[in-house]
Amino acid sequence: MQKIVINVEWCGLNYSGGYGSPDLGVCVATGDTWEEFKQEFAEAMDFHLEGMEEHGDPLPQWAVDRDYEIEYKMATSALLHRALKYTTLEAISRASGLRRSALKSYATGDVCPRDAQSEKILQALKKISADLQELADSMK
């Protein structure tokens, strides 16, 4: 099974991402929500492959067989935007030690954080998740 890695960003009002390779060209999609983006990308990829087949373009066997899985690699902007469905910038700020204003700039995509800041955000989200799981487990 072939793994297709999709780089996902938050751009203005949408998640957006794409895949490109010398064998397949480029396929892109956008979506208002995370779920919509994933569905739109899967449909766009299938449509792209169908079009290549109809035009007689050569395809790798995995593409002909549709034997692939999609892995999404989220940029910090997309990660933060998706996380805001479950938490707040204030909570992420407390857990990460980063200023709320910086997080807001990262979430909108206006500023691209350095790797160290992205790692702090990821660790903060993992901590928030673990804390919420511990809280839920205490209700059993």
Region locations from a protein language model:
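Hydrophobic micro-packing sites on short alpha-helices
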Residues: Q117-L122
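Short, charged, surface-exposed hinge/linker loops at domain edges
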Residues: M1-K3, E43-S101, S105-A107, V111-A116, ...
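DNA-binding alpha-helical recognition surfaces that contact promoter or target DNA
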Residues: Q39, S105, Q123
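DNA-contacting interfaces and partner/effector-binding or oligomerization modules
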Residues: M1-D57, Q61
